[in-house]
């Protein structure tokens, strides 16, 4: 299922005819250019590789320069892939625009969430705090026990503990499309999406309709 790579512009709100305020995220979806078409014979799977935006040639390393030169496509700010079926008719250099969402009501959006740094268990995992008084000394926000005793004699993998919060790949599913502005290449979706303003987002038609 193909989609588009865009940029998060920010959040605002729009009003319906009834006067209801709807919070929306504005996403800029400029044309995506196909740089490579992968197939079963050469790559063992079917996909298209796309780029968007413009990147100066002096900012590219040699592998990137060679890749864009071979495809004959203007260098973009990154490379992304979308899986396709065997009978796709995509060609290198072809452009994919915001028009693919004309008959779509909901989308799934993937991005890198805002990094919050090293965080404790209360902030990271919503742990309850311990008693503020009643004999509690310096243990108000500590996680408590992280295991048992000699059996099993280890801490289980995946144990919720303090660590880095955010800066991970996150997907928000089934966001309603509120408006599409084809002239300015803008997509307005209801609600919030992952990432900071200016970050890259992958927008696909929703899997769960």
Swiss-Prot record:
PROSITE patterns: RIBOSOMAL_L3
Keyword rRNA-binding appears in the UniProt entry: yes
N5-methylglutamine PTM sites in chain numbering: 150
A GO term for molecular function: structural constituent of ribosome
This protein's record includes keyword GTP-binding: no
Post-translational modifications: Methylated by PrmB.
Function in brief: One of the primary rRNA binding proteins, it binds directly near the 3'-end of the 23S rRNA, where it nucleates assembly of the 50S subunit.
NCBIfam families listed in its UniProt record: L3_bact
Protein name according to UniProt: Large ribosomal subunit protein uL3
Annotated organism of origin: Buchnera aphidicola subsp. Acyrthosiphon pisum (strain APS)
